[in-house]
């Protein structure tokens, strides 16, 4: 039987349990607590206190998420979209992507090497296939175009 979240202590404990597993954004944590039946006024109070104590941080969440998704082979376009869907502010997302220190061209090249063994496309069909894959992964079209025309990557 799930725990009843009808007291501030229970809501805080559940929020801290979720944060112990991984970083969460405020919107995501609010959604999870509501799904568990916590009243909105208790959620807001608990999350405000966690922010004051430094236990809940949007910037840490953004940094963690960007780093994790980049290591998984996703590009800035895809990461930006996913964070937007999670209810984060556009300006904060852009700042996190600027501050992450990731060389997106290098990440694109590594992904392309891993998936296509560094073989430049020989015809339009193969070029479209590689381009679709890299675009789906969230890399900008201009970066993909440079790479597939032989002007990007290890230069």
UniProtKB/Swiss-Prot annotation:
Compartments where found: Cytoplasm
Predominant subcellular localization, coarse grouping: cytoplasm
InterPro entries, per database record? RecX_HTH_1st (IPR053926), RecX_HTH_2nd (IPR053924), RecX_HTH_3rd (IPR053925), Regulatory_RecX (IPR003783), WH-like_DNA-bd_sf (IPR036388)
Listed A to Z, the keywords are: Cytoplasm
Q: Which GO terms describe its cellular component?
A: cytoplasm
Report whether Cytoplasm shows up as a keyword of the record. Answer: yes
Q: Which family does it belong to?
A: Belongs to the RecX family.
Main function: Modulates RecA activity.
Which PANTHER family does UniProt cross-reference here? Answer: REGULATORY PROTEIN RECX FAMILY PROTEIN
What the entry lists under HAMAP family is as follows: RecX (MF_01114)
Entry protein name: Regulatory protein RecX
